[in-house]
From Swiss-Prot:
Functional description taken from the UniProt entry: Acts as a chaperone.
Upper lineage: Bacteria, Bacillati, Actinomycetota, Actinomycetes, Mycobacteriales
Ranges where the record places region Disordered: 492-515
Name used for this protein in its record: Chaperone protein DnaK
Key words of the record: ATP-binding, Chaperone, Nucleotide-binding, Phosphoprotein, Stress response
PANTHER family xref list: HEAT SHOCK PROTEIN 70KDA
Length: 611
């Protein structure tokens, strides 16, 4: 049996860790560094370069060098190299394969298993794609774990305190997450999580690149954005300047021979970027971290003062403006300086690998699903089966029925999001359950089950209880959730909460009215001989009035018609009850009384159920 490792598969850098004697150890790569750039290059001689070697030749091999592929995970993105198309999974797998090789060289043993981390706000498609990348790399993926959760696991197990509330602020190269967790007695439980899958250090780098391009254009009249090689040099310089500005008040960017002018004379770029200017041009990026932070505090139902520790994760948290913002948001609390933001996630992943392999005892990791899951029901309503921030793995079932008589099949449409109307959420997938036995509407019992495994991957099953027929879908298609979609889900859910609630209530009123008219007519057909023609006429007219009201848009008119039908139905029930009581009066009172009561209760219940 081979060894198990923990891998932080990052946007810009990746890290691998292993348990040695029960203690997590970060493994240095073949170049001697504890972090490996998530860069893959295809050299013109056919060699595939990964990590620092790929990054080093990027300027001279721009079109055949791929970086930040994590931002394309879970989409249909591909890149063509030498007439062969590569998916994001294949490119990610190259990085994983290098980490696997370097770990095997360090351990002197085969590495077969891995726990791989993903941003907490990764969608189902993105998690599935990450797992596939691991499989392509020849790894048995034991578990997909959320990055902030892994960080809290690594941080929390070193603490001697019994109960503690930890806030993890994770700003990496391409993604942002914030999670609130409770740790105590070996249990790591996520209370709430939120994030932004399109926000990370790359965006800060790009702002510096844009600033340099504009400065050069103003000074020299040349637009560097049209020169691929120059842009690659600018990206590398921007990253270095950003890192330098974390410890200095200014950074100089000097790039000789960046391009040539119209007369083929070489041009030089030489600019100095101050920390103040850097913070000014990136302020809006920093502001985008506030909404997920506030959302997590709200969802977890805690106050800032209840947070015991703040843990910063991801190299981008080294920027002074970021750590100052976190301090401000948490009421002046100093973030913990005792963890390495680049390595803590991989360390947590190695610990979780140890838990799953039985090497680490008495540790339980309870993660959550970041967005609600449900299906579309009559009227376009989003019926949620699993609410956001539900602990996973989890399984929830609910029984639905048909909307029409003799309906032969049902279409199950699975959505992810927070809006009350299904169409406003993200469609994850759909499937059909056929072979439903002919029956009046409302009779078939269709049980829909949502099952989210510990990796956060969704399985949905629909089963006809009458025939036993079943159909299952594993949600792995679709393009995942873009930043715009996630922003829309959260912001729209807040902005349109009242509108959604009103529409949902209106649809429920319509559904209830339609059902009541149908059930009342059915009851009248079965019991018509027990009531007078006058009562039958009144009930029928009241049911017809409901049908007429349903044709319009006036919800109050529908409610009035339903109240009238309810009144007439009660009169009908009362008449049937009195008739049966009179018929039973000839029997012996002692023997009859209990039976009459039983019969009345059953009949009354049945009657109510049919209204």
């Amino acid at each position: 049996m081979g060894r198990a490792v923990g891998i932080d598969l990052g946007t810009t850098n990746s890290v691998v860790s292993v348990l040695e004697g029960g203690e997590p150890q970060v493994i240095a790569n073949s170049e001697g560094s504890r972090t490996t750039p998530s860069v893959v290059a295809f050299a013109k001689n056919g060699e595939v370069l990964v990590g620092q070697s790929a990054k080093n030749q990027a300027v001279t091999n721009v079109d055949r060098t791929i970086r930040s592929v994590k931002r394309h995970v879970g989409t249909d993105w591909t890149i063509a190299i030498d007439d062969k198309k590569y998916t994001s999974q294949e490119i990610s797998a190259r990085t994983l394969m290098k980490l696997k090789r370097d770990a095997e060289a360090y351990l002197g043993e085969d590495v077969t298993d891995a726990v791989i981390t993903v941003p907490a706000y990764f969608s189902d498609a993105q998690r599935q794609a990450t797992k596939e990348a691991g499989q392509i790399a020849g790894l048995n993926v034991l578990r997909i774990v959320n990055e902030p959760t892994a960080a809290a696991l690594a941080y929390g197990l070193e603490k001697g305190e019994k109960e503690q509330t930890i806030l993890v602020f994770d700003l990496g190269g391409g993604t942002f997450d914030v999670s609130l967790l409770e740790i105590g007695d070996g249990v790591v439980e996520v209370r709430a999580t939120a994030g932004d899958n399109e926000l990370g250090g790359d965006d800060w780098d790009q702002r510096i690149v844009d600033w340099l391009v504009e400065k050069f254009k103003t000074a020299q009249g040349v637009d560097l954005s049209k020169d691929k090689m120059a842009m690659q040099r600018l990206r590398e310089a921007a990253e270095k300047a950003k890192i330098e500005l974390s410890s200095s008040q200014s950074a100089n960017v000097n790039l000789p021979y960046i391009t040539v002018d119209a007369d083929k004379n070489p041009l030089f770029l030489d600019e100095t970027l101050s920390r103040t200017e850097f913070q000014r041009i990136t302020q809006d990026l920093l502001d985008r971290t506030k909404t997920p932070f506030n959302q997590v505090i709200k969802d977890a139902g805690v106050t800032v003062s209840e947070i015991d520790h703040v843990v910063l994760v991801g190299g981008s948290t080294r920027m002074p403006a970021v750590s100052e913002l976190v301090k401000e948001l948490t009421g002046g609390r100093e973030p913990n300086k005792g963890v390495n933001p680049d390595e803590v996630v991989a360390v947590g992943a190695a610990l979780q690998a140890g838990v799953l392999r039985g090497e680490v005892k008495d540790v339980l990791l309870l993660d959550v699903t970041p967005l609600s899951l449900g299906i579309e029901t009559k009227g376009g309503v989003m019926t949620k089966l699993i609410e956001r921030n539900t602990t996973i793995p989890t399984k929830r079932s609910e029984t639905f029925t048909t909307a029409d008589d003799n309906q032969p099949s049902v279409q199950i449409q699975v959505f992810q999001g927070e809006r009350e109307i299904a169409a406003h959420n993200k469609l994850l997938g759909s499937f059909e359950l056929g072979g439903i036995a002919p029956a009046p509407r409302g009779v078939p019992q269709i049980e829909v089950t949502f099952d989210i495994d510990a990796n956060g991957i969704v399985h949905v099953t629909a089963k006809d209880k009458g025939t036993g027929k079943e159909n299952t879908i594993k949600i792995q298609d679709g393009s995942g959730l873009s930043q715009e979609e996630i922003d829309r889900m959260v912001k729209d859910a807040e902005a349109h909460a009242e509108e959604d609630k009103k529409r949902r209530e209106e649809q429920e009123t319509r559904n209830s009215a339609e059902s009541m008219a149908y059930q009342t007519r059915k009851f009248l057909d079965e019991n018509g001989e027990k009531v007078s023609e006058e009562i039958k006429t009144k009930v029928t007219e009241a049911a017809d009035a409901v049908d007429e009201a349903l044709k319009g848009e006036d919800i109050e008119a529908i409610k009035t018609a339903v109240e009238k039908l309810s009144t007439e139905s009660q009169e009908m029930g009362k008449a049937i009850y009195e008739a049966e009581a009179a018929n039973a009066g000839a029997a012996d009172a002692t023997n009859v009384d209990p039976n009459v009561v039983d019969a009345e209760v059953v009949e009354d219940d049945d009657k109510d159920g049919n209204k």
